[in-house]
Amino acid sequence: MTEEQRQLYLAGGMSEEERSLFLKGIHEKNLVMFKPSQMLLHGPTKRLVDTYHWHSPTKGIVASYTPKGRDVEDHFGIFRGVDQVEAFAQATIVSCATFLECRKQNCTPDQLKDKFIPAFISIGNVNFHYYLEQGDTFISIGNIKFYKWRQMVCDGRIYKVPAGLNLDEYFKDFTEERLLKYDISKDFKLVAELFDITGRAILIELFKKSE
């Protein structure tokens, strides 16, 4: 999807055929068949997810991102811890909750954006074990702990990916059991552990009332 197509999509410019195919994927498949640009409202400079590699709609997700030059600018070439948390949140509570809400309401993200604003509610503990530089591909592995009333809570981990590894191939047979145990190769380097990352889709009317 080009940026021009994305803007048309977010503006509600999907054709009926495209919308039908999108909804078919929402109801019958999972996030792996979608690009993050189709699910996340963030523009290209603030979107911190490149690819969805594995997804179980009610259990969790594995997604990846590779920090770009703009992500480490003026920060010694290091991808900041706060951006790691943001990347994890986009991959988990935002992507997964958007998918489930679209399924529930039989709609697309562009229709959701007219009703709700995604909001970061709270963060539990975050423990950093390693660092990430420009070009270091990492995965966010997220476990869904709670989802109700458009609010989602996830725990998870961030791992640096071994150089040259094909993530689509590696995770094609991944399971919910392995997800819960973080059962992956020791070649992955643990970067961060995250707990109780919480977000909620809030009605736009509530924001307008507070103005």
Regions found by a protein language model. Name each.
Residues D71, G81-E86, K104, S140, ...:
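Short, low-complexity, polar/charged sequence segments that are solvent-exposed and flexible
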Residues T66, Q90, V94-T98, K145, ...:
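Short alpha-helical scaffold segments that flank and stabilize functional sites
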Residues Y52, I121-L165:
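Hydrophobic beta-sheet segments that form the core/acyl-binding groove
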Residues R80-K113:
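Active-site helix/loop of acyl-thioester processing domains in fatty-acid/polyketide metabolism
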Residues M1-F79, T108, F116, H129, ...:
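Non-catalytic linker/capping segments at the edges of enzyme domains
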Residues P67, A89-T92, G124-Y130:
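Generic secondary-structure microfeatures
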Residues S64, H75, L100-K104, C154:
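Short linear functional motifs in flexible/disordered or boundary regions
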Residues L100-L132:
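Extended, positively charged loop/linker patches that create polyanion-binding surfaces
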